Amino acid sequence: MTYNDRMTLFARIGFAARGLVYILIGWFALDVAIHGGRPMDNQGVLGTLVDAPLGHVLLGICALGFAGYAIWRLTEAITDPERLSNDMKGRFKRAGHAVSGIVHVTLAMAAGRLALRQTSAQGSSPGDRSAESWSAWLLAQPGGVAILVAVGAGFFAVAVAQGIKAYKARFDELDGRIPAPDYVRWIGRLGYAARALIFAIIGWFLISAALNHDPDRAGGLGEALMELRAQPEGVLVLSVVACGLALFGMFSLIEARYRRISVAKPGFLG
């Protein structure tokens, strides 16, 4: 199997793992909307697989998939196999690939530790605690406020990009008939819209933490879902967003099968 074949396979496993995680996030968030409780972020959802039948096998596959996905995204950022333009839009997209790669490195590590029983499955939203802890560390550094504001603004920018993707709903990165069938476009459209809203809320949390110099205001996916639950008509709002996140998971499974994967070996690998 060539390097390109391996990277394509790992990327597809990564899309499938992401799909599984988002479907579970949506399912648990819908349960919270109806019955109360605290929603889970992606690391919390991985913890629920520990006690599932063949859970450690699933976690091992997720770890492999997330690691492969991370390498693919980081390679995209370095080698630019899509031949993106060198303008601001192209640079922003490559930066997004790099950030996505880093995020999936942390998910691969979390899934790997759980698969090897090296960490506890307890705790519903470790991502929220880590957001608070690294925000506290950042605010203690010179220029930390400005950096945290920039990170929050980055989340807003990603939210806008995902919102635009939901609105246009072209999804021309999928193989097969173009444009994609209407039902696929609607799955992707609703999924990306829900994800855009979550990213915008996380961005606001980070900017608020920076401007108020209060790391407790920072939060991740779990806190964003709790914020929706606390709003007027929160049950309805969270239910809709939960369904949207589950649809994003379904769209990721579609991508695992049909997405065109652009791969280029970094020069330093020979």
Please name every model-derived segment.
Residues 235-255, 259-270:
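A cross-kingdom marker for long, charged
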Residues 186-229:
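Glycine/small-residue-rich hydrophobic helix-like segments
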Residues 5-6, 10, 24, 28, ...:
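Hydrophobic, ordered structural segments
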Residues 77-98, 165-189, 256-270:
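Cytoplasmic juxtamembrane regions at transmembrane-helix boundaries
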Residues 43-50, 134-137, 215-236:
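Short, membrane-exposed interhelical loops at transmembrane-helix boundaries
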Residues 18-25, 98-112, 190-207:
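Hydrophobic alpha-helical membrane-insertion segments
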Residues 19-39:
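Alpha-helical transmembrane segments of multi-pass membrane proteins
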Residues 34-44, 119-132, 171-175, 213-223:
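Peri-membrane helix termini and adjoining interfacial loops of integral membrane proteins
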